[in-house]
Amino acid sequence: MKWIPQSARFCLFGQSPSAKGVFNIYQLNRGKLELMSEWQKAFGIKCGTFKASPVSIRDVATVDYKGKLIIYDIERGVEKYNVQAHAHMGNQIDGIGGKGSEFGAPELVTGGADGCVRVWDPRQEAPVVSLEPSENEPIKPDCWTVAFGNAYN
């Protein structure tokens, strides 16, 4: 669940019992929740962030159970960016920038069950940085969390 910036709405992500992706938008209206939009996606959505999107646009970046990084237009529920970020499930995502030229380019960081950490610029198809476990490691550790921090314009 992520609050939509500067609104009384939030996105709810997840996976249904039929293993389809859940992407719902709810709005608070006089203390009650109203379902505004409901979309079913091909695969479960693990998590998302608005941090790499300007407030005026409010695109949400997500990682799913098949390792895809997808940026959605929340007003229409359509994909604006779609790339295979990880070989297995994406576990976490964070973002920074994209708020204007003084705050830098939009960037996303993802961590996955394949043990990789990748930094993405959504204006490009490939990651700008990819940290991967050694090829000769018998067991690849999961990457459970990622975050941008201490980065001020």
Give the location of each predicted region.
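WD40 beta-propeller repeat fold
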Residues: 1-153
